[in-house]
Amino acid sequence: MKLCATSSEPARAAWPLSEPALAYFPDARSASDRDLAAGAYSPGVAMEHIPVLLDRCVELLTPALTRRNPDGRGAVLVDATLGAGGHAHRFLSDLPGLHLIGLDRDPQALQIAGERLAPFGDRVSLVRTRYDGIDDALAQTGVAEVSGFLFDLGVSSMQLDRTERGFSYSADAPLDMRMDSDAPLTAADVVNTFAEKDITRILREFGEERFAARIAKHIVRRRPLNTTGELVELLYDAIPAPARRTGGHPAKRTFQALRIAVNSELDSLRAAVPAALAALETGGRIVVMAYQSLEDRIVKTEFAAATASRTPPGLPVELPGHEPEFVALTRGAERATPEEIERNPRSAPVRLRALEKVAGRPTTARRDAR
């Protein structure tokens, strides 16, 4: 197995490991929303990692990975959100010739996935980076074009299970929320040092919280806040009682907003999807699973642009060379079936979208022409 670092990360020695536990929504993707809404999460209890929509991901990506050889030889799959490696393990097991590049910013996730995928040897390359570091990761691993991309967005249950990471509002822990434990900014930094107007903006834009200004005012008045428990208590005071009785846990939107801000999740996604589309070879495929509307909106917008014709509107026929570069493999966003949700409650809120690249024009040229 090859262990790589991004250009901004020092190379790391081999990772000693422990066993995994992983993956994870309702309609606002707070770290614990998926599991709490499904009644599937208890603080401090490690949960079995059941990869979300695993069979559907295999069904969608395998044709691209077996175009050259039925065993996957010559194909490269990038798992841009490696986590504990559940999806990656299935693809490597099914396709004994496949090479997989796994990306994750969380060193603990890479430790867990590294041990899990160690039996596959040099067919696996792991890179510590955010998923918007795709270009650098491919350069480091010597890969020019990719056969398939898989994105499973959001926070993993592995991160939720580690109470000290501060992602869950169901247990008292330090206000951390960093996906990369070496990153400088924490949720405590945001609530304790940001201006009231900036906290309001974060809660409104990233949490779609209608009481954003009210909550920000309470935060500034009461800070410093150092634990998730202190923040939850404040939110119960800040949000009017009638609103607390509807729409799920009153903390979910604030926790979602802080987590997104701390980890620059949406900016990273906006850069990652176009980079992935540009790196796909003709016949390659991309699958993205999103768990809340902010993520899905970005994916939907990028996919719509990728599947649009460049023929000027009003012409009755498609101009040669102006055909869409990608075709959709799903009709809109697919949801988990009742059977899947019963087997894996965490899949209830997922929205899956997939594309196939059918033309060889550079994606960057298409985007510049918009």
Swiss-Prot record:
Domain of life from the UniProt record = Bacteria
Q: Which GO terms describe its cellular component?
A: cytoplasm
Please indicate if the UniProt record lists DNA repair as a keyword: no
Q: Which InterPro entries match?
A: RsmH, SAM-dep_MeTrfase_MraW_recog, SAM-dependent_MTases_sf
Q: Which Pfam families match?
A: Methyltransf_5
Basic and acidic residues bias spans: 332-345, 353-370
Name any one GO molecular function: rRNA (cytosine-N4-)-methyltransferase activity
Keywords for the protein's UniProt record, in alphabetical order = Cytoplasm, Methyltransferase, rRNA processing, S-adenosyl-L-methionine, Transferase
Report the subcellular localization: Cytoplasm
Q: One biological-process term from Gene Ontology?
A: rRNA base methylation
Top-level EC class: transferase
Segments carrying the region annotation (Disordered) are: 332-370
Describe the reaction catalysed, as an equation: cytidine(1402) in 16S rRNA + S-adenosyl-L-methionine = N(4)-methylcytidine(1402) in 16S rRNA + S-adenosyl-L-homocysteine + H(+)
What residues does S-adenosyl-L-methionine bind to?
Answer: G85, G86, H87, D104, Y131, D152, Q159
- EC number(s)? 2.1.1.199
Main localisation, per the record? Answer: cytoplasm
Function per UniProt: Specifically methylates the N4 position of cytidine in position 1402 (C1402) of 16S rRNA.
For this chain, the family text in UniProt reads: Belongs to the methyltransferase superfamily. RsmH family.
Report the protein name in the record.
Ribosomal RNA small subunit methyltransferase H
Origin species:
Mycobacterium sp. (strain KMS)
- Which gene does this sequence derive from? rsmH
